[in-house]
């Protein structure tokens, strides 16, 4: 059978002077950055859902793409054909990882037993494809939001039978992820939220999803899964208000149910936009709270109130993101998954490559500039100087709980404190960042 992307052998690094649109201009996998290969810093992954499952439909139009595996026919045979094309794409794009939802790779079927049988078959197919290609699984997850049964949520559903079906999907997807050597397992609460408080018991739903997550953690330890569990925050869409609104909200939830040491976050840039935050803010918040895990690299449109899932193309924005990640020691089990899709009018199959190549070059440049910022050290020095007072005897006594409010009041009076404001030098810092980026 002829390959689907028959006009391309493999995308390779050709340098910034190349005019080849099917080549990397900045992403050189073997280039050493801060003592580590660029590929090992970035840990790129392509996603199954936007790339091979979306047919181009939107709220106002039908499918626009010609994808042979999306035509009518035997569902399992078409899933196998899709897997063949997917791994051809992963290989030719030269990405080390991929990600999937259960029903991205396997037909859901007409019953729970059909779902289980189909997924078992496709897990074996994926294992064969991974072994033949060398492509690995960054993370797996379960789609507990598309089917009509999940109209009122999965773990937060008012019906415990729906909760049980969702638990079966997550149980099965976790086992498949472990079997395939997945390095993480993601939990995104697509419909874990509400449309109106008039028919919603917030306390009840919070208890339900808390218990669900506890069961996921219990299953991880029971089976010996060595990967990281990740929650992906999102404020709204498809529901009006979702319980995993942003990083800070997720952390509060994890603390309530004693899970802050068990589950980290997978941060999507577009979801940060929807929450009214910068991507930089969400990354820095997760790192500060000790729950940073992985990234869905994309971008949203700040003028639109929905998830546009465009490919990342802002080197400036992503340099600051990579700066935070590098300062924190880089990825461990996580990586940069492109949760992004081509535009509906981009109907040429090679548009899939153009989108990913541009995104990979963007993140490669961001990594290089972030490394310059790390090596130069000026930004860190300015921040350290700004907070230096907290390393003094007074600062340490406060932080270590050795002074009460009354004692601090007495100290201030006895020492006749009269502190003066010190400049934050924001403009200077912004100029420095621009010089790293533009010279």
Swiss-Prot record:
SUPFAM superfamilies: Xylose isomerase-like. It is found in: Cytoplasm. It comes from the Bacteria. It catalyses: alpha-D-xylose = alpha-D-xylulofuranose. Signal peptide: none annotated. GO terms for molecular function: magnesium ion binding; xylose isomerase activity. Its EC number is 5.3.1.5. Binds 2 magnesium ions per subunit. GO terms for biological process: D-xylose metabolic process. Its main location: cytoplasm. Mg(2+) 2 binds at residues 268, 271, 307, 309. The active site is at 101, 104. Its cofactor is Mg(2+). Mg(2+) 1 binds at residues 232, 268, 296, 339. Keywords: Carbohydrate metabolism, Cytoplasm, Isomerase, Magnesium, Metal-binding, Xylose metabolism. One of its GO terms (cellular component) is cytoplasm. The keyword S-adenosyl-L-methionine does not apply. Homotetramer. Belongs to the xylose isomerase family. This is Xylose isomerase. It comes from Yersinia pestis bv. Antiqua (strain Angola). The gene is xylA.
């Amino acid at each position: 059978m002829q390959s689907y992307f028959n006009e391309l052998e493999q995308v390779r690094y050709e340098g910034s002077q190349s005019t080849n649109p099917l080549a990397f201009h900045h992403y050189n996998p073997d280039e050493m950055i801060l003592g580590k290969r660029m590929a090992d810093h970035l840990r790129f992954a392509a996603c199954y859902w936007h790339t091979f499952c979306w047919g181009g439909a939107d709220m106002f139009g039908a499918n626009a793409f010609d994808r042979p595996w999306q035509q009518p026919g035997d569902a399992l045979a078409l899933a196998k054909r899709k897997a063949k094309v997917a791994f051809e794409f992963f290989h030719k794009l030269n990405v080390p990882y991929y990600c999937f939802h259960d029903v991205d790779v396997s037909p859901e079927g007409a019953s729970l037993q059909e779902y289980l049988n189909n997924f078992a078959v496709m897990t074996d197919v994926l294992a064969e494809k991974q072994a033949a290609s060398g492509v690995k699984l960054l993370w797996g997850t379960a789609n507990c939001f598309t089917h009509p049964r999940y109209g009122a949520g999965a773990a937060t559903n008012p019906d415990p039978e729906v909760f049980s079906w969702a638990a079966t999907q997550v149980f099965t997807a976790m086992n498949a992820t472990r079997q395939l050597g997945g390095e993480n397992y993601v939990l995104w609460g697509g419909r874990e939220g509400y449309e109106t408080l008039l028919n919603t018991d917030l306390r009840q739903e919070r208890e339900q999803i808390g218990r669900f997550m506890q069961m996921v953690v219990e299953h991880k330890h029971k089976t010996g899964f060595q990967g990281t569990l990740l929650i992906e925050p999102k404020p709204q869409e498809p529901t009006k208000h979702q319980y995993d609104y942003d990083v800070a909200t997720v952390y509060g939830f994890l603390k309530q149910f004693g899970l802050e040491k068990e589950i980290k976050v997978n941060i999507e840039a577009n979801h940060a936009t929807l929450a009214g935050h910068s991507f930089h803010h969400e990354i820095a918040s997760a790192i500060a709270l000790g729950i940073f895990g992985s990234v869905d690299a994309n971008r949203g449109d700040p003028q639109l109130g929905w998830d546009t899932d465009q490919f990342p193309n802002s080197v400036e924005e992503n340099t600051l993101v990579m700066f935070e990640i590098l300062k924190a020691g880089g990825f461990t089990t996580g990586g940069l998954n492109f949760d992004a899709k081509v535009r509906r009018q981009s109907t040429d199959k090679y548009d899939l490559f153009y989108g990913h190549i541009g995104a990979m070059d963007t993140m490669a440049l961001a990594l290089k500039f972030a490394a310059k910022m790390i090596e130069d050290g000026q930004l860190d020095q300015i921040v350290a100087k700004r907070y230096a007072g907290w390393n003094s005897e007074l600062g340490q006594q406060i932080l270590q709980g050795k002074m009460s409010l009354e004692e601090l009041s007495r100290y201030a009076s006895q020492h006749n404190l009269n502190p003066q404001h010190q400049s934050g030098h924001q403009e200077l810092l912004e100029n420095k960042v621009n010089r790293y980026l533009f010279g």
